[in-house]
From Swiss-Prot:
Lineage: Eukaryota, Metazoa, Chordata, Craniata, Vertebrata
Similarity-based family: Belongs to the BCKDHA family.
Gene Ontology CC annotation, any one: branched-chain alpha-ketoacid dehydrogenase complex
Name this polypeptide is given: 2-oxoisovalerate dehydrogenase subunit alpha, mitochondrial
PTM comment, free text: Phosphorylated at Ser-333 by BCKDK and dephosphorylated by protein phosphatase PPM1K.
Length: 441
């Protein structure tokens, strides 16, 4: 066919031979193609030769309407009662692995409740819960290798929880005490851990997307047998950085998984006001990215999709987009009151009828791997573990104020050194006006 003959590297050269004739001939009059040659090189009008798209000509004016394209289906493995729908899609995870999924999700939920209340009591300055989205974090984390690099947004604490990040460090970061690896210089919930390959979170939306693509490109060039996973919400997908990241990943063929948590709201803006197309997964094919939409409240669906995307991203050096449909049960943050823009009944429906933790618990009960006594014991144990870490973090001092100026340059510039010295003189003179006894010396 013409598509096979007119390859990008040969098309122009062959077209020139058709127009100019054989070497040594003068003009078109000396060139007489045979019947075989006429069949081999059909008219250029048969198929478009434009370099920017692969398509066919039509002779009828018609715009493509988005509402006539059927929506991308939502892949799921188990129903709301924890029953496997199609046995061939069952990941057949061993009991201990499923219990680890469940314990990670419920421990995260317990930590959320305690830290949310601590902010309301004025003990920490800010917090963001993960209620209702635990399945997206933990299910995807379980499908990754521990060395895969993670770029999060600000609602992926479950990835760190699954990777056994200590509760003490979660608490230290939220309190900004001397045990915080970030030395108290980040907002709460902006975690980072080099040892667990989790890049420190940045508040501005979507900045992590092109950064993650760059990291994936570097991994590809190094033949590292590693992928990068980049998490973001559907609201962040409206940022320009998302477009840049998607396009770079596709054209540079980077081994990356774009993991979009579509939880229904970008702070107070519902999805109906964010976009008119079919969600986020529908954007992938336009960039040349393999895409899938999954039930984010089904931890096994999330696991399967991430596992396969990871396998193919490494084997084929190409990006994948996963849109996990879920619901943000909690407020956007402790600075938000979601009752101003959504009903209590709406929230209660998702909390009571389709919660990822409830669904996985039902699966465990169906398998005979869990019972009510174990549930009560684990709830008590997990709360005790969180409270112990909480109380320990609360007793610790804040980092020394002089650390405000460190860790920016390898060698501190003179200007920063002068500022550091100025702060030290100020505190020495007016120290009685500051709670310096709460800070490390």
């Amino acid at each position: 066919s013409a598509a096979k003959i007119w390859r990008p590297s040969r098309g122009l050269r062959q077209a020139a031979l058709l127009l100019l004739g054989r070497p040594g001939a003068r003009g078109l009059a000396r060139f007489h193609p045979s019947r075989q040659q006429q069949q081999q090189f059909p008219s250029l009008d048969d198929k478009p030769q434009f370099p920017g798209a692969s398509a066919e000509f039509v002779d009828k004016l018609e715009f493509i309407q988005p509402n006539v394209i059927s929506g991308i289906p939502i892949y799921r493995v188990m129903d709301r009662q924890g029953q496997i729908i199609n046995p061939s899609e069952d990941p057949h995870l061993p009991q201990e692995e499923v219990l680890k999924l469940y314990r990670s999700m419920t421990l995260l939920n317990t930590m959320d409740r305690i830290l949310y209340e601590s902010q309301r009591q004025g003990r920490i300055s800010f917090y963001m819960t993960n209620y209702g989205e635990e399945g997206t974090h933990v299910g995807s984390a379980a499908a990754l290798e521990r060395t895969d690099l993670v770029f999060g947004q600000y609602r992926e604490a479950g990835v760190l929880m699954y990777r056994d990040y200590p509760l003490e460090l979660f608490m230290a970061q939220c309190y900004g005490n001397v045990s915080d690896p970030g030395k108290g210089r980040q907002m709460p919930v902006h975690y980072g851990c080099k040892e667990r390959h989790f890049v420190t979170i940045s508040s501005p939306l979507a900045t992590q997307i092109p950064q993650a693509v760059g990291a994936a490109y570097a991994a590809k060039r190094a033949n590292a047998n590693q992928i990068v996973i980049c998490y973001f919400g559907e609201g962040a997908a409206s940022e320009g950085d998302a477009h840049a990241g998607f396009n770079f990943a596709a054209t540079l063929e980077c081994p990356i998984i774009f993991f979009c948590r579509n939880n229904g709201y970008a702070i107070s803006t519902p999805t109906s006001e964010q976009y008119r197309g079919d969600g986020i997964a529908a954007r992938g094919p336009g960039y040349g990215i393999m895409s899938i939409r999954v039930d984010g409240n089904d931890v096994f669906a999330v696991y399967n999709a991430t596992k396969e995307a990871r396998r193919r991203a490494v084997a084929e050096n190409q990006p994948f987009l996963i849109e996990a449909m879920t619901y943000r049960i909690g407020h956007h943050s402790t600075s938000d009151d979601s009752s101003a823009y959504r009903s209590v009944d709406e929230v209660n429906y998702w909390d009571k009828q389709d919660h990822p933790i409830s669904r996985l618990r039902q699966y465990l009960l169906n398998q005979g791997w869990w019972d009510e006594e174990q549930e009560k014991a684990w709830r008590k144990q997990s709360r005790k573990k969180v409270m112990e870490a909480f109380e320990q973090a609360e007793r610790k001092l804040k980092p020394n104020p002089s650390l405000l100026f460190s860790d920016v340059y390898q060698e501190m510039p003179a200007q920063l050194r002068r500022q550091q010295e100025s702060l030290a003189r100020h505190l020495q003179t007016y120290g009685e006006h500051y709670p310096l006894d709460h800070f490390d010396k």
